Regions:
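Short linear Ser/Thr-Pro motifs
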Residues: 3-6, 46, 68, 87
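Preference for short coil/turn "hinge" residues that link or interrupt alpha-helices
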Residues: 2, 18, 33-36, 137, ...
Length: 174
């Protein structure tokens, strides 16, 4: 047990993001980590596999948090017993996204689905040219930051900026 999770680093969350790591950590591995390392208190689950997420939810130790790492799957995960989200979209549209999450936490999933439906196109746009380019482009479109990015990142395209300007105006996302 000579690992970072057993050397007193405090509570940690495991990140399950196959899109970044190129491999998927199985539900069984997640559950073994949850049982064997008590300071791993939860997982940011972005496998895109709702059945895998359900196996984790059904078999997790008491107190182990399962947080969505995929904004578009958050309400489905919470509906199944998930605990919340570590969100990209909340960086660009915090009030609107939190409205969806707070409705879901109260069990008002139909209302949460409707609220997210008004946000879905903008959330999808955040990932059109990759993260964090989409978030930065959305914030620049609202006049909150400048469009300049540090290498190796590049500014969002003119098409993406135009798309955000339209969506921000249409859905009152400022």
């Amino acid at each position: 047990r000579d690992s970072s999770t057993s050397r007193g680093l405090g509570d940690v969350y495991k990140r399950q993001i196959p899109g970044r790591s190129v491999i998927n950590m199985t539900a069984e591995t997640t559950l073994r980590i949850a049982r064997d390392f008590p300071n791993v208190i939860g997982i940011k689950e972005a496998s895109g596999d709702i059945e895998q997420m359900q196996r984790i939810l059904d078999n997790r130790p008491e107190g182990f948090l399962v947080l969505s790492g995929d904004d578009g799957m958050t309400l489905d995960l919470m509906r199944r017993g998930g605990d919340g989200v570590i969100s990209v979209a909340a960086n660009a549209f915090p009030q609107r996204f939190m409205e969806c999450i707070n409705l879901a936490k109260r069990g008002a999933f139909d209302e949460a689905d409707r609220a997210f439906g008004r946000l879905r196109e903008a959330v999808d746009a955040l990932f059109a040219e990759g993260n964090p380019v989409g978030v930065k482009c959305a914030l620049a479109s609202m006049g909150l930051i400048g469009p300049t990015m540090r290498l190796p990142l590049v500014e969002g395209s003119e098409a993406l900026r135009s798309r955000f300007e339209k969506l921000i105006a249409e859905y009152d996302l400022r």
